Amino acid sequence: MLQNSTLALTDHEVLSISTVLDAVRKLDNAGVDQCDPLIITQASSLSQLPVESSSLDIVISICRSLEFPCDKLLAEISRVLKPGGTVLIQKTSQSVAGIKDGETSLERKLLMAGFLEAQAIQLKPVVPSEGAQSFGIKAKKPSWKIGSSFSIKKAEKSLPKFQIEDDMDLIDEDSLLTEEDLKKPQLPVDGDCEVGSTRKACKNCTCGRAEEEEKVEKLGLTMDQLNNPQSACGSCGLGDAFRCGTCPYKGLPPFKLGDKVSLSGNFLVADI
């Protein structure tokens, strides 16, 4: 097997070394003076390159056919190039429109073959002829190997740490209370009036019974009528709409006969 740092492929029958070196110079290669390229002519019939894998720095393809190099040959070029190696494909067109279409098609073809950084460059035609113009596309083989893998370390998230000082001043809740707050509340007396079958308000009544009796007196009702309401007509408990003009229960809310009638504290207080 032949080995060399630079390989030139062409579908021409003859290709001069100077043409290959001019193409190498377009790649800004500093070692072009020491370059001794390997040239393969009529390479369109090749299905495999006679070069070891990952042994070349540069592969140059100078062709006149639009189908050269084919997809299979591009895969071979990728095989023989070192990781990060450069490939240059030079073609000829008779029109400016053909150059634009050829560059676009060739860039897409190289990207589909796995090459990176496809870029168009201007080149001299291999065979000078009237109206013929050359164009070239250079690209690079990825610097990593196909099928290589590496592990990605997941960044560990640390929870924020809060420092609590043990000697922090704590407020005693009892110190917030005043002397008035500490006094025991006095519960109201249930009833200090006389206890019996007929309870009446005492002289110094403080439980509110005197006020209730005063309201009853204004209505003209007796305590017996309130405690045991009776009705001769049977309509007194239905409400004012059914009561007669002299009904003693007029003004009271509806109630059931036989139930004790209770007055609210604001029964006789004016609304306005």
From Swiss-Prot:
Region feature Linker, mapped onto this chain: 153-182
Alphabetically ordered keywords of this record: 2Fe-2S, 4Fe-4S, Cytoplasm, Iron, Iron-sulfur, Metal-binding, Mitochondrion
Domain of life: Eukaryota
Gene Ontology MF terms: 2 iron, 2 sulfur cluster binding; 4 iron, 4 sulfur cluster binding; electron transfer activity; metal ion binding
GO biological process: iron-sulfur cluster assembly
Region (Fe-S binding site B): 233-247
Presence of keyword Iron-sulfur: yes
Residue ranges, annotated region (N-terminal SAM-like domain): 1-153
GO cellular component, as recorded: cytoplasm; mitochondrial intermembrane space
Cofactor needs: [2Fe-2S] cluster; [4Fe-4S] cluster
Chain positions recorded as [2Fe-2S] cluster binding sites: C193, C202, C205, C207
Subunit-structure text: Monomer.
Protein name, UniProt field: Anamorsin homolog
Organism: Vitis vinifera
Lineage, opening ranks: Eukaryota, Viridiplantae, Streptophyta, Embryophyta, Tracheophyta
